[in-house]
């Protein structure tokens, strides 16, 4: 389905921003600008938006193909997909070619693809735009009723009226968390293992959430935390 992943010592990823080995710092630098219109994104990120993260396309073609198939079945040709980082997985000894990652991205049918950069997303913003993403940034903050949702790759502390939805967690439980500053009782573990990282088994079996499936969670914050 995808071209063979090529690891080449001459592939230096010269377009990387602030490389740390083969990793990047996630915060954008002054000379880097997010791509895409924030106002438009606030309209697109709604109850029918689908979310996934940490695809780590180096984890094996068979597993990646199954995940892409699941995405295409759920999102369809016209749906909206927000990816919370880590399309690939770089290492200190080898780089995955841009061609392979682009082929995986292009196999996702919908043209409405948006990317929040992860620590393994080592290419430039322009590269990800050329791959077909309509929005590329280090984070996205959208209003949601009485609260705000802050989408990031790495979990960050947020104010009491904000929910942080993120990827990146590589703990043994492998669950998404919503994080809130100074509200330790409000750390909520989602019922399904939507962030599956390298194995992806649960993601293939269980799928991944549309924001509409989080309604009870947001209702909880609306009424219990923001009044």
Give the label of every model feature segment.
Residues 11, 18, 26, 212-215:
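Intrinsic-disorder/low-complexity peptide segments enriched for small residues
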Residues 129-227:
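Conserved beta-sheet core of the metallophosphoesterase superfamily
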Residues 12, 56, 87-88, 120-122, ...:
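Catalytic metal-binding/acid-base residues of hydrolase active sites
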Residues 4-11, 47-57, 148-155, 183-187:
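Active-site-proximal beta-strand elements of phosphoester/diester hydrolases
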Residues 11-14, 18, 40, 75, ...:
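Low-complexity, compositionally biased segments
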Residues 2, 46, 78, 145, ...:
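Alpha-helical hydrophobic/aromatic positions enriched in membrane-embedded helices and signal peptides
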Residues 8, 15-23, 30-43, 48, ...:
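Core catalytic region of metal-dependent phosphoesterases/phosphodiesterases
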């Amino acid at each position: 389905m995808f071209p063979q992943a090529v690891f080449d010592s001459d592939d230096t990823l010269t377009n990387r921003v602030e490389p740390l080995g083969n990793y990047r710092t996630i915060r954008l630098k002054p000379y880097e600008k997010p791509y895409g219109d924030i106002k438009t994104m606030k309209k697109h990120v709604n109850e029918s938006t689908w979310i996934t993260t940490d695809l780590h396309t180096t984890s094996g073609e068979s597993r990646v193909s199954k995940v892409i198939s699941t995405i295409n079945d759920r999102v369809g040709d016209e749906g909206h997909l927000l990816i919370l980082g880590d399309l690939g997985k770089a290492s200190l000894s080898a780089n995955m070619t841009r061609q392979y990652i682009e082929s995986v991205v292009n196999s996702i049918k919908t043209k409405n693809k948006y990317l929040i950069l992860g620590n393994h997303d080592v290419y430039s913003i322009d590269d990800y735009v050329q791959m077909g993403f309509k929005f590329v940034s280090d984070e996205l903050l959208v209003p949601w009723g009485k609260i705000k949702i802050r989408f990031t790759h790495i979990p960050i502390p947020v104010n009491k009226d904000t929910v942080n939805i993120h990827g990146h967690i590589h703990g043994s439980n492998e669950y998404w968390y919503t994080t809130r500053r100074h509200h330790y009782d409000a750390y909520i573990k989602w019922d399904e293992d939507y962030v599956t990282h390298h194995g992806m088994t649960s993601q293939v079996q269980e799928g991944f959430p549309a924001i509409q499936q989080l309604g009870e969670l947001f209702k909880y914050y609306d009424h219990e935390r923001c009044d």
